[in-house]
Every structure is written in C-alpha cells, then in structure tokens.
C-alpha cells in the first residue's frame, strides 16, 4: 500500500510489481457507486474476485463515504458473490473500537489491520468470515506464514493496546476533540478568506485548500498544494509539525487535550492570514 506518499508520482504502484497485477486490478473513483456497478457489469461479476476499499479514505487526505455508499457496495457484493474487503489499516480501532465497520454498521467479508493494532510496533493482521479463514492452512489449502508472524513482542504490545482501548473507551472524547478542531479550523480559514474543505471522522482529520465538495481523488487533485506548502512551513515555524503532504490525513491521540487543539487552531489562524 504506497499511500499518499506516491499519490502524485503517476505510477501504478512500485517498480518490481508485475504488469499483470495492474492489468488485473481496476481502479474506481471512491464514492461512485454507479460507475462501480457499471464496471462490474462490464467485466462480469464472475470475473471479479473482490472489491477492496478503505471505508474511510485516508490515503488521499481524508475523504468520508457518502451516505449510502458503503451499504451500496455491501449490497452489490452480497448480490453478486464478490468478496468485500475493508482496508482498516487506518480506521481499525481508531474511529471506533470495532473500526469503521462498527461505526457505519457495514460488515465486510475480510478486513486488514495495522497501525493501532500494533501498539507502536510493526503488526499486520487480517480476518473475516469463518468459511474464508478456514481456507488457510492447516485447515485449508492456502499457505500463509512469515518469519516474524505472531512475533511475541509485537503481539503483547498489540493486545495491551486493544485492551486499553476497550477498558478506557476514549472514543467519545476523541470525537469531541475532532469536532473542536474542525470548528476551529473552519473559523481560521474563514477569517483568512481561504476556501477550504475541513472534516473529521473520530480522531482522523482532513483539510483541503479546496472549496469543495471533496468526495473522490479527482476532486482531491484540485486542492491548492502551493498554499498548503506555505501553510506547512508556517505551521512548522510556529512549532506545530504536520504531515508534509497535502494528501495526508491528520490524527488526534488520547494525549491531546482541548488546550492543544486550541493552540493548533490559533496558530493556524495566524499562519493562514500570513500566507494566504
């Protein structure tokens, strides 16, 4: 998963990826259920192994699913027998304890996880329907293993993190902090006369210098990246480090406070007036 770091490089993935991988992968605009349906019909549902997506897109900034989009994808997959795979690497245990599938009430057939589930250590995980997981060895014919699979240190850190999230339930507080950041940034951009689209999903944050709407990657590409570069440098000078790409989501952690959120939005208000 190259993520937003290569979003503007004009490459399909990475050198070393066989052409057949790209040839057998069809990319569809996020939030476009009609085109997805047309594409499946054109290819033939029996030729489509799976539909994989981030339930909340976090690799092009932050783009939220339109009302009914995820349910529409779920219905399409259920009707055709195509597997639905949620990439919950970012959203898993972050937007809710049960991830985006809990938050939006949509159950995929398979899910992938990383980041939060590792408790700061490198962990990747996947899971899903019992009949699919039963295909893995030793109960099934699909072999999946690795030298560091089930690494005890990483597993211990991950379990401790997930149990802590379960026991402390920080999600309402993180939701409130995200809303506070959105309100502060909307005020800051309005005062500076800057067109911006600002949103959050729990502790995931997104801002584009774009009047909106921003619901897919084509619209994301219309954001003012030159203004973002000036904003990034201004915020860095103010002592606030942001991801250096306009297409990176931001995140709040349980260590953030209302005071820190307010300091951030106050700094943004000053910087935006200086660089707009």
Where are the language model's segments positioned?
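Catalytic PLP-binding core of fold-type I/II PLP enzymes
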Residues: 63-95
């Amino acid at each position: 998963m190259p993520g937003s770091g290569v979003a503007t490089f004009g490459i399909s993935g990475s050198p070393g990826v066989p052409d057949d991988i790209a040839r057998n992968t069809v990319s569809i605009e996020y939030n476009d259920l009609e085109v997805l349906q047309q594409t499946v019909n054109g290819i033939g549902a029996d030729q489509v192994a799976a539909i994989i997506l981030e339930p909340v897109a976090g690799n092009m900034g932050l783009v939220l699913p339109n009302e009914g989009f995820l349910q529409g994808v779920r219905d399409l997959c259920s009707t055709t027998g195509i597997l639905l795979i949620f990439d919950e690497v970012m959203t898993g245990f972050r937007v809710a304890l049960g991830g985006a599938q809990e938050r939006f009430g949509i159950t995929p057939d398979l899910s992938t996880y990383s980041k939060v589930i590792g408790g700061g250590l490198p962990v990747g995980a996947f899971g899903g329907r019992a009949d699919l997981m039963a295909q893995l060895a030793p109960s099934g014919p699909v072999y999946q293993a690795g030298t560091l699979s089930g690494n005890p240190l990483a597993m211990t850190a991950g379990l401790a993190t997930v149990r802590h999230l379960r026991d402390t339930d920080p999600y309402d507080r993180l939701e409130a902090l995200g809303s506070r950041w959105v309100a502060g940034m909307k005020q800051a951009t309005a005062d500076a006369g800057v067109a911006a689209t600002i949103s959050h999903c729990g502790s995931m944050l997104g801002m584009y210098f774009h009047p909106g709407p921003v619901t897919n990657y084509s619209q994301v590409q219309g954001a003012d990246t030159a203004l973002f570069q000036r904003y990034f440098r201004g915020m860095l000078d103010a002592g606030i480090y942001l991801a250096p790409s306009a297409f990176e989501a931001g995140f709040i952690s349980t260590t953030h406070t209302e005071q820190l959120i307010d300091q951030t939005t106050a700094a943004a208000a000053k910087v935006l007036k200086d660089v707009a």
